[in-house]
Amino acid sequence: RPYQNPAVMATRNKTSKYSLRDNPTGIYAKADETLAVFVGDIYEGGKVSMLIQDLNGGYNNSKTYELSEGYNEITVEVGGLIYILNHVNDDIPLRLEDADNDQKRNIEAKTVKVHFANGKVNGYFDIQKNKESDWAQIRDNAKYQEIDVLGEYSHLTWRISDFKKYNTEITKTIENLDRL
């Protein structure tokens, strides 16, 4: 689905923009791997891209690839977690339930379907879809070193080994982060 570009609110609030990684896929790739990515209809004027983030080299160690409708074959230069970027300058709230009918129609019109024919499944936790009882299975099945955890307002990417070591209560953790 589309998300409002963080630069819009950053300009309005006179702050810096933060993460553009609003659409985690739960997929990861290794460097030099070739991915087959199918993309549905892209709305007029839309730009959809795939970002691969390797936190081993720091937050700025990422590579973005523009996607086009149909079949995309991409040999990735950087391995890591994969995100789909679909940013708009429209007035779209972060939470779908906060959208009015016009905003919901706009979100629906600018949602682009993306399918990975290959790639490795890592999974992610989304507090709006998952429960605490799902967490152990999601965490234990993750194959990459980090995993994405989505709250209602927050997005955390952290090392799986730390979540396991400290037996993290994930819903409590992300709810606390949402309240910040």
Regions found by a protein language model. Give the residues of each.
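Catalytic cores of extracellular degradative/oxidative enzymes
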Residues: 135-180
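Compositionally biased low-complexity segments at domain edges in trafficked proteins
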Residues: 104-106, 115-154
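Beta-strand-enriched, solvent-exposed domains that form extended recognition/catalytic surfaces
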Residues: 1-123
